[in-house]
């Protein structure tokens, strides 16, 4: 005989199951809609990013509450108010000011669990003082594709509408350079190329400085642009590629990381890589002998994509908020220098 005190009747079991199902459905609905038990939508928290010192500027720009909304990032607040250190969700430090000691790390006690972000868009060759920053930073914001917050100098995005016509060409190759040092590989390669083809040089080093818009207009009249980076490092592809060449409407002749790094961010037929040639003479012969049909193929990407630049530090810092939910908690860069030099 069944003991009624130990086992509920079938009807009671059914009622209990229905009640539990209703409760679970309600909880699931609250979770999906972000609603509080009272029915009102649960407020979404705003992420506050404290910029400890603004890059390259003694006076930071205006940072209204909707700054990041302009870049498609909601519920993100940028501030330079250091009194908010204790309550900031993350604090970001631009390395150049730490390197030159124009700025220092906070003297106040670091809030427990607060992530600190190391930010730099410079190459390792122009970065010093990382050794004293062991165990300080949790996240990295840089051009490196393996950064916690990856911020490229530019990227290709789907184009809406037809591409603008290609600018008329009157010259073969151009180069804009401000820092001209004989020991740099780019200077050595330029001098070798100049023995075999004409390269028109602009910029401070040539005594012909150009404003940003002037640069684009000047380069647009050339078939090729020497997108030579000042140093060769992993993923270091700067505005020399994105703005000075692709945006201007010239085919970039690139000197920088290996071809694979460029192919990770642009079509393989959108640029000429110097490493594909055994000598400067071979490269010069390739450029000077290219017919119009072959040349036009280097612009096939323009039918599908447009260039978007990321040059505004406000947008770069807003990217921290965009990545914030996915960023690794508890991570510490014990050897930031070793990571960055790799």
From Swiss-Prot:
GO molecular function, one term: 4-galactosyl-N-acetylglucosaminide 3-alpha-L-fucosyltransferase activity
Annotated keywords: Disulfide bond, Glycoprotein, Glycosyltransferase, Membrane, Signal-anchor, Transferase, Transmembrane, Transmembrane helix
Residues bearing glycans: 81, 291
Tissue distribution of the protein: Expressed in thymus, spleen, liver and lung. Highly expressed in the thymus and lower expressed in the lung.
E.C. numbers: 2.4.1.-
Primary location: membrane
Disulfide pairings: 68-76, 211-214, 318-321
Function field: Catalyzes the transfer of L-fucose, from a guanosine diphosphate-beta-L-fucose, to the N-acetyl glucosamine (GlcNAc) of a distal alpha2,3 sialylated lactosamine unit of a glycoprotein or a glycolipid-linked sialopolylactosamines chain through an alpha-1,3 glycosidic linkage and participates in the final fucosylation step in the biosynthesis of the sialyl Lewis X (sLe(x)), a carbohydrate involved in cell and matrix adhesion during leukocyte trafficking and fertilization.
Protein name: Alpha-(1,3)-fucosyltransferase 7
Gene of this entry: FUT7
């Amino acid at each position: 005989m069944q003991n009624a005190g130990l086992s509920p009747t079938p009807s009671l079991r059914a009622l209990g199951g229905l009640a539990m199902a209703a409760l679970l459905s309600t909880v699931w609905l609250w979770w999906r809609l972000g609603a509080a038990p009272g029915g009102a939508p649960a407020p979404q928290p705003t992420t506050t990013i404290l910029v400890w010192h603004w890059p390259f500027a003694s006076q930071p720009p205006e940072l209204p509450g909707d700054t990041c909304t302009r870049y498609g990032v909601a519920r993100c607040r940028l501030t330079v108010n250091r009194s908010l250190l204790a309550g900031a969700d993350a604090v970001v430090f631009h390395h150049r000011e730490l390197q030159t000691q124009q700025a220092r790390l906070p003297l106040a006690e670091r809030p427990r669990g607060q992530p600190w972000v190391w930010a730099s868009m410079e190459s390792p060759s122009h970065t010093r003082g990382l050794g004293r920053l062991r165990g300080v930073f949790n996240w990295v914001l840089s051009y490196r594709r393996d950064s916690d917050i990856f911020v490229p100098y530019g990227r290709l995005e789907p184009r809406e509408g037809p591409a603008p016509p290609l600018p008329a060409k009157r010259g073969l190759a151009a180069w804009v350079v401000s820092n001209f040092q004989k020991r740099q590989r780019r200077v050595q390669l330029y001098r070798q190329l100049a023995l075999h083809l004409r390269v028109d040089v602009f910029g401070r080093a040539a005594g012909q400085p150009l404003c940003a818009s002037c640069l684009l207009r000047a380069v647009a009249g050339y078939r090729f642009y020497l997108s030579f980076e000042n140093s060769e490092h992993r993923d270091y592809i700067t505005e020399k590629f994105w703005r000075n060449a692709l945006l201007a409407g010239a085919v970039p002749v690139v000197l920088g990381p290996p071809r694979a790094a460029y192919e990770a961010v642009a079509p393989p037929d959108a640029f000429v890589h110097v490493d594909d040639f055994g000598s400067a003479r071979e490269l010069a012969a390739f450029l000077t002998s290219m017919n119009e049909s072959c040349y036009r193929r280097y612009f096939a990407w323009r039918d599908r994509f447009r260039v978007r630049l990321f040059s505004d530090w406000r947008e770069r810092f807003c990217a921290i908020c965009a990545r914030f939910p996915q960023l690794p908690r508890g991570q510490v860069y014990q050897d930031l220098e070793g990571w960055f030099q790799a």
